[in-house]
Amino acid sequence: MKVAIIGATGYGGIELIRLLEQHPYFSIASLHSFSQVGECITNVYPHFQNVLVHTLQEIDAEEIVKEAEIVFLATPAGVSAELTPKLLAVGLKVIDLSGDFRMKDPFIYEQWYKRAAAKEEILSKAVYGLSEWKRSEVQNANLIANPGCFATAALLATLPLVRSGIIEEDSIIIDAKSGVSGAGKTPTTMTHFPELYDNLRIYKVNEHQHVPEIEQMLAEWNRETKPITFSTHLIPISRGIMVTLYAKVKREMEIEQLQKLYEETYEQSPFIRIRLQGEFPSPKEVRGSNYCDMGIAYDERTGRVTVVSVIDNMMKGAAGQAIQNANIIAGLEETTGLQHMPLYL
């Protein structure tokens, strides 16, 4: 199956290229850019030399559909909302890595993203592509809203507790830390090497745009869920996310019950790895892979459960999950082309 990538020169775009070039079923028909049309991708990123030869093309839905069936949008918020109606109109399936189609309520999108929302008729067609929890909807979708990186790690950790109803609905606290690639390709003072090296920074306190998508998804599984407390930090690594979830249980529990809950929830999910009791993962152990690793603890003194969830923000948090969703759409095993061992060193 032929695919196209729009926004091919951003970090999400080049990760898609890396994965799709090694995929046994998908092949890249075309790469598209806004600012570097006519350039060969190897001139922009020399590490692709002798691997692929593609000239970056203009974005024309009528031309793209002549060769491709699926389009990946690795574009900033606001851009996808403008492009997607044209792509859907010519019969392309769209997997969008931006936040433009994650929120069902346009008012909430505008409140958190500070920009105009996509048209409601397009929003209504979008499926939130958290693969492990939305497989059946993804399978028949024409438009996938690929989840945010923080949201992916947070939801995979939180949903088993929320669905089971065993935690106090107003007790969810999520502390999240990300490598610098999560901030995107455009440099800022905050991501400048001297500012972040040997340092860490909290940012978007109570304002991060992944909050509403987390709350929206939690509410799908438990309408009693209340607003969450969510904080995000930049740490001096290139890629990787660690989320630490805290929540208070409604009644006394045994750690074995919680361990069993997670193991049974994800027993049919090949990319979710639950650590043995008392063991906890680190981002290095999933780097370069599509895995989400989790460890669970329970504090009898406080009645709180702690879940540690780690992913590679460029893989399970972006391009990897996008291809996982494409696999589901194409009727393939969802692991196809994604069975990379983590790059520990």
From Swiss-Prot:
- Which residues does UniProt call coiled coil? none
Q: In which pathway does it act?
A: Amino-acid biosynthesis; L-arginine biosynthesis; N(2)-acetyl-L-ornithine from L-glutamate: step 3/4
InterPro entries recorded: AGPR_type-1, NAD(P)-bd_dom_sf, NAGSA_dehydrogenase, Semialdehyde_DH_NAD-bd
**Keywords from the named record:** Amino-acid biosynthesis, Arginine biosynthesis, Cytoplasm, NADP, Oxidoreductase
Q: Which GO terms describe its molecular function?
A: N-acetyl-gamma-glutamyl-phosphate reductase activity; NAD binding; NADP+ binding
The record ties this protein, via Pfam families, to: Semialdhyde_dh, Semialdhyde_dhC_1
If you read the UniProt record, what top EC class would you report for this enzyme, in one word?
oxidoreductase
Localisation: Cytoplasm
Question: Active site located where?
Answer: 149
Q: Where is the signal peptide?
A: none
What EC numbers are recorded for this enzyme?
Answer: 1.2.1.38
Question: What Gene Ontology terms describe where this protein resides (cellular component)?
Answer: cytoplasm
Superkingdom? Bacteria
- GO BP: L-arginine biosynthetic process
What Gene3D superfamilies would the database entry show? Dihydrodipicolinate Reductase, domain 2 (3.30.360.10), NAD(P)-binding Rossmann-like Domain (3.40.50.720)
Q: Which reaction does it catalyse?
A: N-acetyl-L-glutamate 5-semialdehyde + phosphate + NADP(+) = N-acetyl-L-glutamyl 5-phosphate + NADPH + H(+)
Role according to the record: Catalyzes the NADPH-dependent reduction of N-acetyl-5-glutamyl phosphate to yield N-acetyl-L-glutamate 5-semialdehyde.
Family under the similarity heading: Belongs to the NAGSA dehydrogenase family. Type 1 subfamily.
Q: Which HAMAP family match?
A: ArgC_type1
- Output this protein's name: N-acetyl-gamma-glutamyl-phosphate reductase
